[in-house]
C-alpha cells in the first residue's frame, strides 16, 4: 500500500499563488488520505516551507546534482548557492531533506567525494544516487558510461561519508549489475 505521496513541479521557482495551490493539495492529502507528503518544487524560501509544512508536507527533495566545483559546468539557470539556501531553509522549517546527485556527467572522482561531503555538511536525511544514461541529442550524449567499479566505489564512498543517511539507488540503477 502507499506510504507517501510526492508533488513534483518543473521549473526553477514557483509563484506564491502556485505555492498556495500546492499547500491546499498537501492539506487535502493529509486530512483525507492520511499519508506523508513530499515535495520537489524548485527553489523556495523559508516562508514557503513553513506554509507547506503546516499544510502537511513532511519531506523536501532538492538534488544538488553534482559537486560545488562542477555545478557551473552542468547548470546555467541557478547556482549551487541557490540550492544550498533552499535546502537550509527547508531544514530550518523542520522538513526532512532528500538531496542527491547524478554521477557520470563528466565529473572527476574528487568531485564525487565532494558531492558526498557537501551532502554531509547539509545534513540531509536521504540521498538518491542517479547514474547518467547518455541520450543522443542532449548535451551529455557523448559521456562515457561509468564502469561497474566506478559506480560501486562511488556508492561505497557515499556510504562511508554518509553512514546514517538513507542511500537511494535511483535513476540508472539497472546499470548496477549487482542490483538485480
Where are these regions (language model features)?
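Core AdoMet radical
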Residues: 1-87, 96-103, 125-130
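Conserved, mostly hydrophobic/aromatic
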Residues: 7, 62, 90, 119, ...
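Alpha-helix N-cap and loop-to-helix initiation/capping positions
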Residues: 17, 21, 75-82, 107-114, ...
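Hydrophobic positions in alpha-helices of CheY-like receiver
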Residues: 25-29, 90, 158, 162
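Catalytic cores of alpha/beta
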Residues: 44-54, 105-120, 174-180
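Short, flexible active-site loops
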Residues: 96-104, 112, 133-143
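Auxiliary Fe-S-binding modules of radical SAM enzymes
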Residues: 120-180
